[in-house]
Structures are given as structure tokens and as C-alpha cells.
């Protein structure tokens, strides 16, 4: 089966733009706050939130690079979505999509590919927002000397919320697709 490429939906385009803004903020925030940091900063914190290792403030500049990896990969996958679905379907593990896509009229298939990538973009955006919050908490901790409770809350949020929202969104799209084919 070959699905013709089409542009993202308006929702997908908005999520893509928000992702680009979030990635830019992941880089902008550290660059803007870097000059406010002392030369020696806490670079590791123990379980209680107290620093247990110190180093140069330059070490903190790795955060935007590390935090940008997952969102950047998701944006690349989104850009290549039709190539992946048409040539390498084994890399896209969406059983409900593959079970139903053959039942959808050919001219609507690209629409549904784009709809299934909306939650992927939302996942990336939530991760980026969580990473930005973690970045803020870490930079705040370098000045205050202690990780704020906010860091731990965001850490839990970054782990749990994206997956919950991702699977909820996917199930909604699968239900809409099933309604379109009359099941």
C-alpha cells in the first residue's frame, strides 16, 4: 500500500510550530541566564536535593543539547512520516492504524496518517515543556544551592504525563477512524 503525502492538519502544523518554539526556548533560556551564574556551580544533586558535586558553569550548557535530542528526533520522524509508512512500515508500530487504513478510502488515507502524527507531536511538545521546566529548576538550583520541589514534580510529569496523553490521544483518533469506516 502506498499512501500519497499531504501536509499536516492545522492542528499538526500548530503543534509543529510550538515544538520549534519549545526547542528554541530550550537553548535560549540557558544562553540568557548563563552570565548570571557563578563560575563554579553545583553540577550534581543528591536524593535530598543538596549538591554533591561542583564544576564549571560551562557544564550546564550540555542541558539544551541533551534535552533537544528527543524532540528533534520526533520532528525528523514527523517530516519523514510518509516515507516511513510507505517504505518501512515495521518502524511505525500502530496496530489500530494498520488494521483500519486499508478500509479507508484512498484519498482519506494521508489525512489519517497526519492525524496519527498529531499525538506524536503533542508528546514531543510535552517532553520539551517538561525539559524546559527541569532546565529552569536546575539553573535555579545552581543559584540557590538546592533543587526545588518543582524539579521532582516536573520529573514525574515528564515521565508519566506524556505517555498517558499520547495513548489517550491515539485511542481517540482510532475511535474516530473506526467511525469513518463504519465499525
Curated annotation (Swiss-Prot):
It comes from the Archaea. Its main location: membrane. It is a multi-pass membrane protein. The chain crosses the membrane at residues 13-35, 60-82, 117-139, 149-171. Keywords: Cell membrane, Membrane, Transmembrane, Transmembrane helix. It is found in: Cell membrane. The keyword Cell membrane applies. One of its GO terms (cellular component) is plasma membrane. This is Uncharacterized protein AF_0163. The lineage of its organism: Archaea, Methanobacteriati, Methanobacteriota, Archaeoglobi, Archaeoglobales.
